[in-house]
Amino acid sequence: MGVYYLLFGKLLSEGTLARLGISASLSPAQKDRLSRHFRFYQLLPPKSKALFEYRVAKFIRMKEFVPRNMTHVTEEMQVLIAASAIQLTFGYPKVFLSYSRYVIVFPDQFFSNAGQRYPKGEVNPKAKAIVLSWKHLVEGYSKSDGVNLGLHEMAHALQLENIVMNDEYDFLD
């Protein structure tokens, strides 16, 4: 039996998605990372997991991940950052934070020229970027104190997305 995705209310196979020109799927290793490290994904029913995987893969494909003060952004980083965005936008059918073209990843807190400070994350509208400290993103998902950098910064990106005139404009009341 093949893998199926729930898309626009219909259950579609990977083959159907490919014929439609939609080729967003996660590798087994990427799915494993979600299963091991992402509680929201773990709690989803199977059909919703398939849709979540599709949306994570599409988010990764749509963004340029840029390393700062590190050699590269790993696949694990891409998957968990994308999962943060999709967790927040999962109830919206076509919201992928498209205004933010770049995801800039630092290993730890960084100096922000825009804010002249050392934040853990920010959304920089001028650079069209979501900027994150990897260390603090991971801490946000491992602690139970209610502080989650990934969701916090993706919420800023979502707010910006609602303001900018593009295909994802004006979806919030």
Roles of regions detected by a PLM:
Residues 41-43, 68-70, 144, 168-171:
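Zinc-dependent metalloendopeptidases
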Residues 53, 57, 61-131, 139-142:
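Auxiliary, metal-adjacent structural segments of Zn-dependent hydrolase domains
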Residues 160-173:
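Post-HExxH zinc-binding segment in Zn-dependent metallohydrolases
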Residues 45, 145-162:
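Active-site recognition of the HExxH zinc-binding catalytic motif
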Residues 134:
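Conserved binding/catalytic microenvironments
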Residues 1-5:
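N-terminal juxtamembrane/topogenic regions of multi-pass membrane proteins
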Residues 6-67:
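N-terminal topogenic membrane-targeting module
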